[in-house]
Design a protein with these regions (language model features):
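Jelly-roll (double-stranded beta-helix
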Residues: 1-133
Length: 133
């Protein structure tokens, strides 16, 4: 969940989860029956979905303030800035400024990413890799 007061999920096995804008991630298959109830008002969420036979994926929440180095080992990397401040990304010497509520898609560019934020930031990193073709 990127913005809003929260969301309650009821999984088909009876387990309940509450998502808020704190970086908590819910992982489930698309065929699982899940119901949701808003806590208070509308939300903005981020869903990362792939065809399991063709791709693998991982989603990570990363808290950032100052500088941090992240190794990109994915064929496709999505960086989503869920913070209220801009984040600077140096990908192989190419600088990208990701404004609040925006993302960056990096394709077939493995190697280190230098991340920088002057204020506390929350980034979501989605890593996608193709299964054997």
């Amino acid at each position: 969940m990127l913005a809003g007061k929260g969301l309650h999920l009821q999984r088909e096995n009876g387990r309940r989860e509450t998502l808020s804008g704190d970086g908590t991630i819910a992982v489930f298959g698309g065929e699982e029956a899940i119901s949701a109830q808003l806590q208070d008002g509308l939300i903005t969420d981020l869903n990362l979905m792939t065809r399991r036979g063709a791709w693998t994926h991982d989603l990570q929440a990363l808290r950032l303030q100052g500088e941090q180095l992240v190794e990109n080992d994915a064929e496709v990397l999505l960086l989503w800035n869920a913070a209220q401040t801009a984040v600077r990304v140096d990908a192989g010497g190419v600088l990208h400024d990701i404004a609040a509520g925006n993302g960056l898609l990096v394709e077939n560019e493995p190697g280190p990413l230098h991340l920088q934020s002057q204020r506390p930031a929350l980034l979501y990193l989605g890593r996608l890799n193709a299964r054997c073709r």
